[in-house]
Amino acid sequence: QTARQKGFIPVLTTNGTLLSQKKELLDALPHKIQISPHAHEGNDRKNADTYINKVMTFAKEAAAKGCIIVLRLWNEGGYNQMNEAILQLIAQHQPAPWTERKDGWKLAENLFIEHDNMFSWPDSKQAAYDEPEVFCYALRNQIGVLADGTVVPCCLDHDGELALGNLFELSLEEILSSPRAQAIYRGFTNHTAVEGLCQRCGFSIVSKRFRR
């Protein structure tokens, strides 16, 4: 609500595991919520039926209230062995027919499935990519906020390796104006990754085609 009042169009991205515990979100829905069921297989988790049941219960209620819900299967060419099972579980909650789109399906009003190619998540233990030019929307169009209030450049930093500050201690303006945050922003403006973790992220390579 505060974001809307300040003129922002809030979009949240989540793996959906905590949505059933955050029902108050239904009373202050953002413009869009992007939920990533592909993370379930990628993180080697079990009980997909329980997970999808919780995700779809929330998704359908949020969509009915006008929030755009996008269920993302961004794992083509990678951890996608469970995709068919996940689609079948989704269909139990929102039966076909679905309207086919170039990047997935429209299941119902405000409810979509989107598929795309898999990219490598950043891993500080891996070697850096040898790429002369990269780009990322981190701190430009998006930030990540972990469950404890830690702000990171994007949602791929799930361990908080690039912690920029905590919203329970600092304002977002203070966090984004910090020297480290500004260095990351300027780096991607110049098509370079200044942080080691970003140098090991496959998305910064994929997204360079969107650079601006």
What is each PLM-predicted segment?
Residues 61-154, 159, 193-208:
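A C-terminal junction/extension of Radical SAM enzymes
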Residues 156-212:
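Flexible mid-to-C-terminal extensions adjoining Fe-S/redox cofactors in radical SAM and related proteins
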